[in-house]
Amino acid sequence: MIFSTSPLRRPRAALLAVALSTALGGLYFAPESVQAKPAVAGEVDIAYQEFTLPNGLRVIVHTDRKAPIVAVNIWYHVGSKDEPAGRTGFAHLFEHLMFNGSENAPGEFFNPFKQVGATGQNGTTNSDRTNYFENVPTTALDMALWMESDRMGHLLGAIDQKTLDEQRGVVQNEKRQGENEPYGQVFDVLGEKMYPVSHPYHHSTIGSMADLNAASLEDVKNWFRTWYGPNNAVLVLAGDIDLATAKEKVAKYFGDIPATPTMAQPRVDVAAHDKDSRSTMTDQVPQTRIYRVWNVAEYGQPDLDELQLFSQVLGGSKSSRLDTRLLHQDKLVDSVSTGAFGAQLGSIFFLMADVKQGVDPAKVEAVIDEELKRLLKDGPTATEVAQARTVFKAGFVRGVERIGGFGGKADVLAECAVFTGDAGCFRDSLETLNNATAQSIRAAGDRWLSRGSHTLVVTPGPRVALAEDPAVTPAPLTLPAVDPKYTTTPGVDRKTGIPSTDSYPQLVFPELQRAKLKNGSTVVLAERHDIPVVQVSYEFNGGYSADAGHKLGTSSFAMGMLDEGAGDLDSLAFGNRAESLGANLSAGASLDGSNAYLSALKENLDPSLALYAQMLRHPRFEQKEIDRIKASWIAGIGQEKAQPNGAALRVLPPLLYGVGHPYAMPFSGSGTEASIGSLDREDLVAFQKAWVRPENATVIVVGDTTLKEIVPLLDKHFGDWKGEGQAPAVPAVSDVARPAGTRVYLIDQPGAVQANIFAGEVVPSSKDPGAVRFDIANAVIGGDFTSRLNMNLREDKHWSYGARSSTPSALGQRPWIASAPVQIDKTAESIAEMRREINEYFTGKVPPTQAEVARMQAIQIRGLPGSFETAASVLGTIGGIVRYDRPDDYVFKRKAEIESLTPEQVKAAAATVDPKALTWVVVGDLKQIEAPIRALDLGEVSIVDADGKPVAGAK
């Protein structure tokens, strides 16, 4: 199945998430050091070279020296599409198994990477491929290649029944976690409706419980022997590396791995529908949602690029036709989105709309059909084509800033190579977008969207567990003959262990340059000239805490309204102008402040700043837009309350801080239905005048500019800006006392297959001298994958997909929160384990060990050189420097403090938390969890609703 279980978002900024435009078929291995095609004129490019080992491993190399890191990205051409009946979920299960150590590196695969400061490490599986990726310091590349090659060539001896059972349990809890979310079963239904039983995309990537339970150790090993060889993989190395180095190291570590069978890929099968179909389902959701899906052209077809542009015009932006009609004119929905998502055998065009309360979904469907038919008949306008093209080209420019991670340059090259055989196929996609016309876009839409689609309508009601397909006894897995590919003599003696990393790159952070604008604002600039983009963030006081004594949610709502029309431009015109410039503008609030953000293409910096200034200085706050956003906002609060995590994080803050405290509000800052419902234009204007003003504000600029260039431009647009009246004082955030004893609050979620457990307490401010020490203390207990809580509940007990703890930043006391989603029948046991771990750690009974502290120091310190690869990461760090009055060299001082920490200091910092004063919030099916939790005798137990109000009649 090709559907993601995450909510639909706007089409990804990088156009390369879509199908890329070369024909599918057998992989073509280009000669070494040869690039397939020249870049499209005027475009940002990803230069690469490549070679292929004798055993079939294809290696692609991209050099980018801006940071001393290398992205290692390996794609195996196997996914859920390759699973036979009775073995669903095998590809995803193996993704997990391959993180559990190999023959020569037993234990957690993450550990050696953590020790060298690797960043962005992850693995994913979808219908078509499995990938693993990480960014490592250049000096740790040997370690990374040794580890990746060991699990490719030396894994099976490390997989035993215990490991299989452990990871099977983790995967099953991942499945429960996804299905426990609102709309969480939708994509399983869509897969079944869009593809016949015989189609490789019919079943879900995560598989069925029955097949997961039936997986035998020999089945799993034979699956690996079939698919995970060098001749079925593409390795991309991007960053601080060159071709010669890559050749030497890859041959050394991978060259002796024998090839596996050459497996034929399934034929392209778009599974077109001859006519429209529909289905309905009920779920524990706050509002009706409409999904409409078409099967469309596969990866590698220019039509899919054209459909991306079609999607952008139809429903891909705030000024799209469906947004204009359904949100602005007819006011029938709270949100609408479209997207085209590529896959190897056939892609999907996806539409989703959240129907307003009280609106007949049939009316929404009728408007969707009307607008779709109009666009298919007449095509987009020239302006719409130009704007859509600019949006995607700007997104590509922003996306290629990163060498690794989701959508980074290594990901782009691997995706192209695996699915089209041409690592440079993104250039074809760019060319298609450059050459697209209104007629070609309309024609592509007509070819695919005039065919049958499936509509699924989800309405509020009971959640009914989906029946799984009947269990099938799988046919014996017969291994095909292995190709007699030549391999080299082993280049390393693996019995000597993992290569050591003896040195690490120096931390480099951009020099912060400062200036003053004529309006009194401070400018802080960090130059970054790797891509032609400039990012700006105007930082103000007045965040959620400013809502205290006023209507909760005012700060977030007011800031969110700034880009809904400004100056002479109404909401739609403002969106159109931003898209035509390729600019991203937004504004929002956080606990202690607010900010307005601009990402501008260098070529359009001046007009983008002009639009940005209009947004901040002259927001329109039109009543019709207030009414529209208010309705959507209230619906969003309903969505928060329907999600287990969202409900808990709305209820917890008032319990930690006490009613009336500036922080005693939902951590989302969204307010309540009542407070948002009572907001009027005067409230928004008052907030904007009081807090969005240049005095005491800071403009952070990161990107392709200089102080000499940017200050005159900022003065041009903001120099004469003055605040009205006296600026209000920053809200005083007083400390609160902890409760005298443990408290437990339960929120009912009938029928839930998981319980979501939260435990919280207040700890000192981010400005406290001991804040860094506490951050390391938190990392040991729950702030890292290798932490005590996660190793216990996920890796040892496999009751949870992941347990963690965190301490968000705050000027006042910070909330420390531990959390874990667990299988419903292990709720009380999981709480008992969490309580034991927390009590033993924070009381000093089982204090942090030297090894634990050293591990967290290594993770924090050695990852720093790679942490500032992107302008966004630099911008965020400067934002913290500004908000918390830190020195400009804070990143270096923090590094030095972490390096100097001892276990005794971390133990003392951990003593900040009092395990006897914890507040527990648990969301789950009370029929299953209430009695076992009460039997734990943690403390007083209260039953509350998703607003934190006592439930009448509860014990």
Which positions does each model-derived feature cover?
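Bacterial N-terminal signal peptides
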Residues: 14-28
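Short, conserved charged micro-motifs
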Residues: 141-143, 243-247, 302, 359-363, ...
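A common structural junction motif
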Residues: 149-159, 253-261, 369-380, 615-621, ...
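Bacterial N-terminal signal peptides that target proteins for export
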Residues: 2-18
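Short, conserved secondary-structure transition motifs
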Residues: 170-178, 269-283, 388-400, 600, ...
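M16 family metallopeptidases and their MPP-like homologs
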Residues: 60-62, 67-85, 89-93, 107-154, ...
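Proteolytic maturation boundary segments
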Residues: 26-29, 33-59, 242-282, 293, ...
